């Protein structure tokens, strides 16, 4: 595939992640809408509000971990992405039809299942089309979709909710996801002629082939340390995106319209920092990549501490922006390290394992933050959980660097 064509696929995946994340954050914005809270009897119950994000992430994590090997073995990334887009659009449209909190939680969990394999499929595409020393930038560019999705999602959902009501905003998002998502996948995401998605049929039974892929993924070197970093990274992402709107409106007094743009600003900063991290990865040796987690984790933790203990708006804005910049620079290092170690035929499933387990653990972070807030009486008090996540990033990154450096020295001896 020509240079330009393979990058068209990366850009398409970027925008696919954008619309997926815009769809995910709608619940965080809904939690400041009195009509939505009254409809599902959620007013004043921070723990149950956090549960809406938790059940989504539980479905997401299980799907990323268990469904990805089937998709990688049997469908390939193009057909699997098509199926995923259709399912998550239908489930988004069904969300306001839930007549109770329990039914809404079920729909949210199924939505998580439909979106779970997305990053694994994205990782498969990049491994398919880019050499080992070229993957830092495409990993970073496609991962920009996380920040762009949050940047666009917060003000977009706020606008739709303010002008069309909370229920109609779900339907409009579903239509947007379906039309744009299918167009992106069908026009720009194509497998290589010799990729795993177009190999001759394997005579082995389906379950044997899937289990073989799954087993190869589990045997990826350094998987445990990369997994710890993924858990910490996702804990920060889901914790901050779930509670930042409530922090700005309930604790700092912003209107819903102002909140939409203010909540997006930190993630705008992380767009540039993620690309910077990807460019850096292509210039350093693989064993040096974990140092990004060490310095990035320490800096992010310090900035969140500054958010919690600042009272002037200028300092709060500075620390929020700096925290997301330091967190964003770490983004591309996780898939790049995994692509370095995983077997080519199981790279999607290996990423599915860490992404799935990472989301299963981080699923409880919004709820845990809600419980801390309920006990302390302030939204900002829950940000202590984010500090803990970044300290874990620092420690796991340091351990991973030591092991990779030792392995390099042994290999050279």
What spans do the regions from the language model cover?
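C-terminal transmembrane helical hairpin of 12-TM major facilitator-type secondary transporters
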Residues: 287-334
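Helix-to-loop junctions at the C-terminal end of transmembrane segments
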Residues: 63-76, 275-286, 373
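Helix-loop-helix hairpin linking two adjacent transmembrane segments in secondary transporters
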Residues: 142-192
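Conserved MFS/SLC helix-loop-helix module at the cytosolic interface between two early adjacent transmembrane helices
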Residues: 62-99
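Juxtamembrane intracellular "pre-TM" segments in multi-pass secondary transporters
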Residues: 1-2, 192-226
């Amino acid at each position: 595939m020509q240079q330009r064509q393979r990058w068209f696929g990366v850009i398409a995946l970027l925008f696919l992640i954008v619309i997926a994340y815009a769809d995910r954050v709608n619940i965080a914005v809904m939690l400041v809408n009195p009509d939505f809270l009254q409809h599902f009897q959620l007013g004043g119950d921070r723990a149950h509000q956090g549960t809406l994000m938790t059940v989504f992430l539980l479905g997401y994590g299980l799907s990323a971990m268990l469904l990805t090997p089937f998709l990688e073995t049997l469908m390939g990334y193009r057909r699997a992405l098509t199926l995923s887009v259709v399912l998550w659009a239908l489930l988004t449209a069904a969300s306001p039809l839930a007549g109770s909190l329990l039914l809404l939680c079920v729909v949210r969990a199924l939505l998580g299942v439909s979106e779970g394999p997305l990053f694994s499929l994205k990782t498969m595409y990049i491994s398919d089309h880019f050499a080992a020393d070229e993957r830092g930038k495409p990993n970073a560019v496609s991962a920009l979709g996380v920040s762009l999705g949050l940047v666009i999602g917060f003000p977009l959902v706020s606008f739709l909710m303010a002008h069309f009501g909370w229920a109609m905003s779900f339907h409009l998002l579903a239509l947007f996801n379906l039309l744009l998502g299918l167009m992106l996948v069908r026009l720009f995401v194509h497998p290589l002629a010799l990729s795993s998605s177009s190999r001759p049929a394997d005579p082995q039974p389906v379950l044997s082939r899937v289990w073989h892929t799954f087993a190869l993924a589990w045997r990826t070197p350094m998987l445990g340390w990369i997994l710890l970093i993924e858990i910490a990274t996702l804990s920060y992402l889901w914790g901050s995106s779930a509670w930042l709107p409530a922090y700005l409106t309930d604790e700092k007094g912003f209107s819903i319209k102002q909140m939409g743009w203010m909540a997006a600003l930190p993630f705008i900063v992380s767009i540039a920092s993620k690309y910077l991290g990807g460019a850096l990865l292509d210039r350093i040796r693989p064993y040096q990549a974990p140092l990004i987690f060490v310095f990035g984790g320490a800096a992010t933790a310090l900035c969140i501490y500054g958010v919690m203990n600042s009272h002037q708006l200028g300092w709060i804005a500075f620390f929020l922006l700096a925290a997301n910049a330091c967190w964003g620079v770490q983004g591309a290092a996780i898939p790049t390290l995994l692509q370095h170690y995983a077997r080519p035929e199981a790279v999607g499933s290996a990423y599915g394992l860490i992404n799935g387990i990472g989301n299963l653990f981080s699923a409880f972070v919004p709820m845990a933050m809600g419980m801390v807030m309920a006990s302390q009486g302030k939204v900002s008090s829950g940000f202590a959980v984010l500090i803990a996540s970044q300290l874990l990033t620092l420690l796991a990154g340091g351990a991973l660097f030591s092991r990779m450096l030792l392995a390099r020295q042994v290999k050279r001896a």
